[in-house]
Amino acid sequence: MATDTLTHATAHAHEHGHHDAGGTKIFGFWIYLMSDCILFSILFATYAVLVNGTAGGPTGKDIFELPFVLVETFLLLFSSITYGMAAIAMYKNNKSQVISWLALTWLFGAGFIGMEIYEFHHLIVNGMGPDRSGFLSAFFALVGTHGLHVTSGLIWMAVLMVQIARRGLTSTNRTRIMCLSLFWHFLDVVWICVFTVVYLMGAM
């Protein structure tokens, strides 16, 4: 009886330790996101200062294609929804559904990056690269930094899917899913700001 009680207490303490470690990691990730907020705030401020510095070159109205960017936006928004479904599946302990929803999220994110690469390539080959004007430098810096963050999120997501497939929904993998969720939804919010400030206002 005493042995059973001791075993139960040890297991409870071990589980409690896992929860504490997971909570600490998520808190630490929130701090990282705050630093990312500062980075993007600086990039937005730089863009606001340089937006009229076209040096006689093209303006936002000349280069932005809103229908194209809307498709990009919907891809990223849909990826946020599918990631939410992956989180729900995690709480239901359904490993296969978690992997399936993450894979769909990855495809939406990859589509977004593919369209962004196409947009950048189209601008550069037509002589509208970041060296053309202050406006274009700020544009490429802001949108490109967001794109690099999405790309890193896709790499993280691919690695996470492999880890879940091999080890299941362990407490460590659950913490990773939650941290990536914070990161992914943060990038959605940043993109909505980019879409509004850069593309919508620039196309007016």
From Swiss-Prot:
GO terms for cellular component: cytochrome o ubiquinol oxidase complex; plasma membrane. Keywords: Cell inner membrane, Cell membrane, Electron transport, Membrane, Oxidoreductase, Transmembrane, Transmembrane helix, Transport. SUPFAM superfamilies: Cytochrome c oxidase subunit III-like (SSF81452). The chain crosses the membrane at residues 32-50, 67-85, 102-120, 143-161, 185-203. Disruption phenotype: Increased reduction of the ubiquinone pool (in aerobically grown minimal medium with glucose). Residues 1-31, 86-101, 162-184 are cytoplasmic. CDD domains: Ubiquinol_oxidase_III (cd02863). GO terms for molecular function: cytochrome bo3 ubiquinol oxidase activity; cytochrome-c oxidase activity; electron transfer activity; oxidoreduction-driven active transmembrane transporter activity; proton transmembrane transporter activity. The keyword Transmembrane applies. It holds the Pfam family COX3. PANTHER family: CYTOCHROME BO(3) UBIQUINOL OXIDASE SUBUNIT 3, CYTOCHROME C OXIDASE SUBUNIT III. Cytochrome bo(3) ubiquinol terminal oxidase is the component of the aerobic respiratory chain of E.coli that predominates when cells are grown at high aeration. Has proton pump activity across the membrane in addition to electron transfer, pumping 2 protons/electron. This is Cytochrome bo(3) ubiquinol oxidase subunit 3. It comes from Escherichia coli (strain K12).
